Amino acid sequence: MDLRYNKYLGLNHNYTENNCITLIDSIYKNELNSNVFDGLWEYLDLPGGKPKDGRKWMKRFSVDSLETWASTVATKVNLTDLQEYDVIIFKSGRLVPTHFGLYLWANKFIHLPEGGFSHIDVLTQEWRDQIASIWRWNGINT
C-alpha cells in the first residue's frame, strides 16, 4: 500500500466540509501541486467545493455539464486505461452525478461515501456499472 494516501483515510463525510470531491481536490493539491479543481468550484458556483445547502447542490448540474467542464482540463479515458490520479465520476440511473472517486492502483480507488469515512475500495463490478466517465487531468505526466 502506498503510504502517501494514509493521511486521506478516515475523514468523516460532511457536505459542508469534507465530501467526495473535496477529498480529490485535497489529494490533487497536496500530491500534484494542482489547483485544477478551483475551476470546477467556480463553474459550479460552489466556493471551495463546500456547499452551504448540503446535498441539494448536486441537483445543480448533470453528468453532461460536469463533462463539459472536465473536457476543458482533462482527457476522457477508458476503464481499461486507468492510471493513478484518474477521476471517476459515478452516476445514478438518471445520469445525475452522485459520487466521485480517485483511482490509485491495482483496481483500487479512494473515495468518501455519503455518511461514511474516506477509505480505499476495490473497483468491483457493482462500482463499474455506475461509472459515468473517467478523466485524466491534462497536467499529469504520463
Give the ranges of each region predicted by the language model.
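Active-site nucleophilic cysteine motif
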Residues: H13-L32
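Acidic, low-complexity intrinsically disordered regions
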Residues: F37, D53, S65, L123, ...
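Short acidic alpha-helical/loop segments enriched in Asp/Glu that coordinate divalent cations
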Residues: N35-D45
